Every structure is written in structure tokens, then in C-alpha cells.
């Protein structure tokens, strides 16, 4: 049996190491300035043949909820194709068309 097919359940997408997403937390960009923000790079897990679109969603920075949200440390590790509903609003997310 092929080792790859034995460890990757059909429900999971295959990881393409050549496709990566650079994420800059809005908190870092606001506090340190955009030029000083350190982007984090995550692998994107795709279904073969998927087309990608990049979108940015963010909270209203004038609201108290947004300020509290920004001050909360967030750690995200992408393990599947993400949608805006599955990641915090301050992150750039990738969706399949």
C-alpha cells in the first residue's frame, strides 16, 4: 500500500509546499507600524485543481470589542482550506472559488 494514501484520509486536502500564505496580524501592524510587522508564513492545504482568491476581513477598529480582540494573543495553524468563518477576522484568509 502507498504510504501517502495510508496516512491521508480522503477527507483531507493535500498540502502543496509551493503554495504559502503570508499573514500579518493587524495588531502587529497597528502597534508596530506596517513596515515593522513580522509576517508569518503558513502552508495552504488545497484540493488539487482549486482556484484561490485572497480576501481581507477586519473588525471595526473603533469598537471596544475590536480593541479587546486585538489585545488577545491569537495562534492559528492552518490545517485545512480556510474560509472567513473559520479564522479570526484580523487574518488574511484563502478561499476556494
Swiss-Prot record:
Residue stretches in coiled coil: none
Cellular localisation: Host cytoplasmic vesicle membrane; Host cytoplasm
Domain named 9b: residues: 8-97
SUPFAM superfamilies for this protein: SARS ORF9b-like
GO cellular component terms, A-Z: host cell cytoplasmic vesicle membrane; membrane
Topological category with respect to the lipid bilayer: Peripheral membrane protein
UniProt keyword Membrane, yes or no: yes
Keyword Membrane: yes
Quaternary data: Homodimer.
Name this protein carries in UniProt: Protein 9b
Species in which this protein is naturally found: Bat coronavirus 279/2005 (BtCoV)
Amino acid at each position: 500500500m502507498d504510504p501517502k494514501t495510508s496516512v491521508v484520509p480522503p477527507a483531507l486536502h493535500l498540502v502543496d509546499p509551493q503554495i504559502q500564505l503570508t499573514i500579518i496580524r493587524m495588531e502587529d501592524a497597528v502597534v508596530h507600524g506596517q513596515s515593522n510587522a513580522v509576517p508569518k508564513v503558513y502552508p495552504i492545504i488545497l484540493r488539487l485543481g482549486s482556484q484561490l482568491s485572497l480576501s481581507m476581513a477586519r473588525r471595526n477598529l473603533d469598537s471596544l470589542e475590536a480593541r479587546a480582540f486585538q489585545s488577545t494573543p491569537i495562534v492559528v495553524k492552518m490545517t485545512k482550506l480556510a474560509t472567513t468563518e473559520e479564522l479570526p477576522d484580523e487574518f488574511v484568509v484563502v478561499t476556494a472559488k
